[in-house]
Design a protein with these regions (language model features):
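Phosphate-group recognition and catalysis centered on beta-loop-alpha active-site segments
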Residues: 19-311
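Positively charged n-region of N-terminal signal peptides that target proteins for export
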Residues: 1-4
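Hydrophobic h-region of N-terminal signal peptides that target proteins for export
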Residues: 10-18
């Protein structure tokens, strides 16, 4: 009996160490800005096989091998944060109305819908529950949290996931420094509409005064003068994040086009210095990047290269 218990504890310890090792490895690669490894971010998790922004979607995306899941948050009537893209629950649940009109407990009564509209047995997760589901398994990008940085930072700290989270928004350098004071382990990524007036000064303010690990760029067309600025961003020891979710985010080079013409779309995005890609086709993108030799690099937390297969 003692031997069985001991074996159980050893297995638990091994799994814990392995989980911590995966996050450490991902962070090392992220911070190294190594262009030989392109990060794949699953938009709202694996929503093709579980309801978007659900615990199931997070777990399935992590099992698929993505590096990061993107989740959306909304604030409840009682001041908590839950996962939901829309401001109302009509599309994603068997309920109706605005998120802000319900308490957390009231929202928990509703069932989440799958992408085909059918009802699942999953319930709306809180931000805390989602972070705990990510812990040790996958990095997490929190969207729609730019106005709540100071409120969600303590939740991130309490769950022990400060080293898992990438926050983002359109805040100024001064706003970010003020709202995240005391939370230096949390990564913040600015978002810029690269084809808009004022984009370059905004980007430069972060590159010079904040030195982010990554910067998300959005652009509607693939033919405008400022597009070449991605090379300056990448040359500033900062990863370029591009979304291939739909045409208006990536100059027309989106996921569904990549299904038949991957080089003209995902390949084009890679040519724009992207080393983080948020996608609605994570499995296919991972396979494409592997064929291109852009998922082979792995590093330990000490910065030394580790054997292939760590990730």
């Amino acid at each position: 009996m003692k031997r069985i218990v001991l074996c159980g504890w050893c297995l638990l310890l091994a799994l814990t160490v392995r989980a911590a090792g995966r996050i450490d490895t991902l962070l090392s690669i992220l911070k190294s800005n190594d262009p030989g490894y392109v990060f794949v971010v699953a938009h709202r998790g694996d929503w093709r096989h579980a309801p978007e922004n659900s615990i199931g979607a997070i777990e399935k995306a992590a099992a698929m091998g993505v590096d990061m899941v993107e989740i959306d948050i909304q604030k409840t009537k009682d001041g908590n944060f839950i996962l939901m893209h829309d401001g109302n629950i009509d599309r994603m649940t068997d309920g109706t109305g605005s998120v802000g009109d319900y308490t957390t407990n009231e929202l928990k009564k509703f069932r989440l819908r799958c992408h085909d509209g059918s009802l699942s047995e999953e319930r709306i997760p809180t931000l805390k529950e989602a972070l705990l589901a990510c812990k040790g398994k996958v990095l997490v990008n929190i969207d729609k949290g730019g106005d709540y940085l100071a409120e969600i930072a303590p939740i991130i700290k309490d769950t022990g996931t400060e080293d898992h989270v990438v926050l983002k928004g359109r805040n100024s350098v001064e706003q970010v420094k003020k709202q995240l004071a005391g939370y230096s382990s949390i990564i913040y990524m600015p978002v810029a509409d690269l084809d808009s007036e004022g984009a370059v000064p905004y980007i430069d303010s972060f590159l010079s005064d904040f030195r982010p690990l990554a910067l998300e760029v959005i652009f509607r067309t693939d033919n405008f003068p400022q597009l070449s600025y991605v090379h300056h961003i990448a040359g500033s020891n900062c990863r370029v994040w591009i979304n291939t979710l739909w045409e208006s985010l990536c100059g027309g080079h989106e996921d569904e086009k990549a299904m038949n013409h991957p080089d003209e779309n995902w390949g084009w995005v890679l040519e724009q210095c992207a080393t983080i890609i948020q996608t609605d086709r994570p499995a296919e993108l991972i396979a494409y990047l592997k064929r291109k030799g852009l998922r082979k690099t792995a590093m330990t937390s000490t910065g030394k290269h580790a054997p292939k297969g760590v990730l």
